[in-house]
A protein has these predicted regions:
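Conserved class I S-adenosyl-L-methionine
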Residues: 43-53, 70, 177-208
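Acceptor-substrate binding/catalytic loop of class I
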Residues: 186, 215-231
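A short glycine-rich, Lys/Arg-flanked "PGG" loop and its adjoining helix->strand segment in the class I
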Residues: 162-177
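Conserved alpha-helix/loop element of class I SAM-dependent methyltransferases that forms part
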Residues: 23-44
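Class I SAM-dependent methyltransferase SAM/SAH-binding core
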Residues: 57-138
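A short acidic, Gly/Pro-enriched loop at the edge of an enzyme's catalytic core
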Residues: 134-149
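A C-terminal cap/extension of S-adenosyl-L-methionine-dependent methyltransferases
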Residues: 224, 230-283
Length: 283
């Protein structure tokens, strides 16, 4: 099990520049949205990173650039990963999870953070990070608390999206903004297989394109709600004004006429749209 995981990490380590580029871009878009549409500088603003993840890149950047930022996730790796953090993780998530986190730190995270620091052009501020274990369906924050809510590739993993959006809207200040990126399930990378994370990269691949929509011989190791863009937009528009929508494309060269016929339940637009970003204001 660990051998396969280490091999996946080694492949992923070759992609950390791409992953960092995506995370840096998402941070920059959220920062610009706050300044342009809420009229506030990032420094000193209360910011929520919804689903900050084990590397917490957006939270780290918000904190480094002076925001009063909080990150939440259902499972969080201690920023100061060491002996004490390892013991806490073993108690909380088990020894296998601890080994995976340790391997990720050695094989991937160091290079990732070096690249993130290069893009930020300043030291990354790990000290004082506010990371909390919390369910997006029950945010333990007051009403109208945050000027900015950021979420990058999180909502596609949630079972109860409407409840999470209710909580997001509740905790967002009037006049505040949310910057939400959603990775779409029908896309080529939507099955969350590491080998298809970046389809334009030349990597060895066992799964055929869009296998997750057909035979699904390589099921995702993370929960996916399988929503389509129209499902997300329907729920977003109930609680927010959509100020901007931007789409990111991928996979055109893999969508042969034969594959398109096999995937006729989805439109070409759905199959070749990796993700969309919505800039939101609370209604």
């Amino acid at each position: 099990m660990m051998k396969g995981y280490a091999g996946a990490l080694l492949r992923k380590s070759r992609l950390y520049r791409r992953i960092t580029e995506w995370d840096w871009t998402a941070f920059g878009l959220a920062r610009s949205a706050l300044e342009k549409h809420a009229g506030r500088p990032l420094e000193g603003a209360r910011v929520l990173d919804l689903g900050c993840g084990p590397r917490f890149p957006a939270l780290l950047l918000f904190h480094t650039f002076g925001a009063r930022a909080t990150g939440i996730d259902t499972e969080v790796v201690d920023p100061a990963f060491g002996e004490g953090a390892g013991l806490r993780m073993i108690r909380r998530h088990g020894f296998a999870r601890f080994l995976k986190s340790l391997a990720r730190g050695v094989l991937f995270d160091r290079g990732y953070y070096r690249e993130l620091r290069r893009r930020a052009e300043r030291p990354l501020l790990f000290r004082g990070l506010d990371i909390r274990r919390m369910d997006a369906r029950a945010l333990d924050f007051p009403d109208a608390h945050f000027y900015l809510v950021h979420s990058n590739s999180v909502l596609e993993h949630l079972e109860d999206v409407p409840r999470a959006l209710y909580e997001l809207a509740r905790t967002l200040k009037p006049g505040g903004v949310a910057s939400v990126v959603i990775h779409l399930f029908p896309s080529l990378s939507g099955g969350h297989l590491l080998e298809w994370a970046y389809p334009d990269e030349d990597l060895p691949r066992a799964a055929p394109p869009w296998d997750h929509l057909l035979e699904n011989r390589f099921p995702a190791s993370v929960p996916l709600n399988r929503w389509r863009e129209r499902d997300f937009r329907r729920e977003l528009e109930k609680r927010f004004e959509l100020v901007e929508v931007e789409r990111y494309r991928e996979g055109e060269r893999y969508l042969t006429p034969e594959r398109e016929r096999a995937l006729s339940a989805w439109s070409r637009e759905e199959l070749t749209t990796r993700a969309f970003r919505a800039l939101l204001r609370r209604r």
